From Swiss-Prot:
Myosin is a hexamer of 2 heavy chains and 4 light chains. This chain binds one calcium ion. The lineage of its organism: Eukaryota, Metazoa, Chordata, Craniata, Vertebrata. One of its GO terms (molecular function) is calcium ion binding. The modification N,N,N-trimethylalanine is found at A2. Myosin regulatory subunit that plays an essential role to maintain muscle integrity during early development. Plays a role in muscle contraction. Keywords: Calcium, Metal-binding, Methylation, Motor protein, Muscle protein, Myosin, Phosphoprotein, Repeat. This is Myosin regulatory light chain 11.
């Protein structure tokens, strides 16, 4: 009986290890940090309330239950870290890196304006995950100055991240 259990466990581990082989250790660590930010109650599972709290932390209050339910239905069950990583792995297969990065910024832009408030982006970059230093923030604003309203064009940032040079602004 023990060999059967070992085989089942090995098969289960092999199934989940495939998703871990899709990413390098740095990427897995970044996904883990993102998971931890979203898992607001720190129970190891992302649920609807975690999503609601995450949206509230980003300034988006009154998210509709239907929207949260649709997000939760993308997973086949409870969203632990392995499921979270698998979901991103499936979404990123064959995806254009610029589209992926733009999509990440769009989550922070619920009105779809193509901009994010400088203050909000700076707060995220200096308090979450791989934190920016004050010098890195200064360099970023020099490269991507906000408009007079304090908004940052994230599409230009995405272009530079993926192509290495600013778009012609003509």
């Amino acid at each position: 009986m023990a060999p059967k259990k070992a085989k089942r466990r090995a098969a289960a581990e092999g199934g989940s290890s495939n998703v871990f082989s899709m990413f390098d250790q740095t990427q897995i660590q970044e996904f883990k940090e993102a998971f931890t930010v979203i898992d607001q109650n720190r129970d190891g599972i992302i649920d609807k309330e975690d999503l609601r709290d995450t949206f509230a932390a980003m300034g988006r209050l009154n998210v509709k239950n239907e929207e949260l339910d649709a997000m939760m239905k993308e997973a086949s069950g409870p969203i632990n870290f392995t499921v979270f990583l698998t979901m991103f792995g499936e979404k990123l297969k064959g995806a254009d890196p610029e589209d992926v990065i733009t999509g990440a910024f769009k989550v922070l832009d619920p009105e779809g304006k193509g901009t994010i408030k400088k203050q909000f982006l700076e707060e995220l970059l200096t308090t979450q995950c791989d934190r920016f230093s004050q010098e890195e923030i200064k360099n970023m604003w020099a490269a991507f100055p906000p408009d007079v309203g304090g908004n940052v064009d994230y599409k230009n940032i995405c272009y530079v991240i993926t192509h290495g040079d600013a778009k012609d602004q003509e």
